[in-house]
């Protein structure tokens, strides 16, 4: 569950710096709407708790979004969410300006940051390819 107070404070901070930035919650959307939203985004933020590797950040990074997460659950480790530690935050009031500044930088200087997701993207693509191979091995499909 996302920390609504933290998200509110982030939105408030961002609105004082750049009124053109839109926050689009990914909820109650069809698969196509999710795809279209992420494909058009420069940044995906997820301040929820990660019980394990999560689908949404994986889809976002696959569609070349920059990523910022909380440090809750498996997002804290570099195995499930392999992005720079500087892009993972404790959701404290003190971190609102830090998160806000990084968000602005990632949006305004998108090209400078998008390569930070290369390792994560490769991991996602490898998992997709190896999944098919594992299924073939399980069922002895040649």
Name every feature range the model reports, one short phrase each:
Residues 103, 107, 134-139:
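Hydrophobic "lid"/C-terminal helical patch
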Residues 49, 55-125:
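Catalytic binding pocket for nucleotide-activated donors in carbohydrate/polymer assembly enzymes
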């Amino acid at each position: 569950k996302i920390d609504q107070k933290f998200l509110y404070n982030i939105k408030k901070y961002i609105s004082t710096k750049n009124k053109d930035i839109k926050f689009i919650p990914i909820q109650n959307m069809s698969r196509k709407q999710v795809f279209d939203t992420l494909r058009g985004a420069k940044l995906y933020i997820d301040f929820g708790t990660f019980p394990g590797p999560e689908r949404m950040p994986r889809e976002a990074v696959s569609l070349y979004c920059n990523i910022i997460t909380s440090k809750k659950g498996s997002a804290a480790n570099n195995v499930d969410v392999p992005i720079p530690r500087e892009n993972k935050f404790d959701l404290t009031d003190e971190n609102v300006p830090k998160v806000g500044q990084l968000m602005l930088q990632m949006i305004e200087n998108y090209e400078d940051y998008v390569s930070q997701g290369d390792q994560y993207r490769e991991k996602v693509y490898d998992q997709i390819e190896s999944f098919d191979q594992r299924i073939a091995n399980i069922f002895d499909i040649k």
